Swiss-Prot record:
It comes from Mus musculus (Mouse). GO terms for biological process: gastrulation with mouth forming second; negative regulation of cell adhesion. It is found in: Membrane. This is N-acetyltransferase family 8 member 2. The chain crosses the membrane at residues 36-56, 60-80. Keywords: Acetylation, Membrane, Transferase, Transmembrane, Transmembrane helix.
Length: 238
């Protein structure tokens, strides 16, 4: 089993963290396309239109060409959307991770294996939490595709949970995309509860891309739950 350790972010990690984030977002494009193809209006355009073309013109070539161009346009739309989101993020909190996260109340960690950064996650306090709540929000969870399925993502989430619990927060909240099925399964398996869902724009609604909200209620510091240091070192679970 490969060894790993989770540590606080350092400036030397910046380039690798940006690479992890960018590659992780690009990997979602095929899943986003598949999800959109299940929507009623997509079923009308594909395969509805090709069938109509064949019935009206008896041309399978024309129908095939239409299908190819339709899928190509979908890919371009999602690629541009992904590129814009990545560019916006790189100009926001990821532009200066130290300034954005490493303050008195937030933090950012990386998972390192064999002197290579293979995962990351951040946490910041929620600015305007519900009355009576003190919430920490989990951000930017990502693990290299070559190191998934080994428990690294779970270890990173546990790091955030322990960090928030040690500081007396009542909940850890997060948002994730509707096409990020593996992330959703991980959060729910760890005890997060889905609390909401919304679309950031009309165009995203047409694409079927929603944002899912999750919350994890933390036990009191003296009660049962996660314990021990949140920065830990050990073998990666199989």
């Amino acid at each position: 089993m490969a060894a790993y350790h989770i540590r606080q972010y350092q400036e030397k990690d910046h380039k690798r963290v940006l690479e992890l984030f960018s590659s992780g977002m690009k990997e979602l494009i095929p899943a986003a396309i598949r999800q959109m193809l299940t929507l009623p209006h997509s079923l009308l355009l594909l395969p509805g239109v090709p069938v109509t073309i064949v019935l009206m013109s008896a041309s399978w070539l024309l129908a095939t060409l239409y299908s190819f161009l339709f899928l190509l346009c979908l890919w371009l739309i999602f690629w541009i959307s992904c590129r814009n989101y990545v560019a916006k993020s790189l100009q926001a909190d990821l532009a200066d991770i130290t300034k954005s996260y490493l303050n008195a109340h937030g933090s950012f960690w990386v998972a390192e294996s064999g002197d290579q950064v293979v995962g990351m996650v951040g946490a910041q306090p929620v600015k305007d939490p519900p009355l009576g709540k003190k919430q920490m929000q989990l951000f930017r969870l990502s693990v290299s595709s070559q190191h998934r399925g080994q428990g690294i993502a779970k270890a990173l989430v546990r790091t955030v949970l322990q960090f928030a619990r040690d500081q007396g927060y009542s909940d850890v909240v997060l948002e994730t995309g509707s096409v990020q099925h593996s992330a959703q399964a991980l959060y729910q398996a760890m005890g997060f509860q889905k609390t909401g869902q919304y679309f950031v724009s009309i165009s995203k609604k047409l694409m079927g891309l929603s944002i899912l909200q999750f919350s994890y209620s933390l036990p009191f510091a003296s009660g049962p739950g996660y314990s021990g240091k949140y920065l830990k070192k050990g073998p990666i679970p199989c």
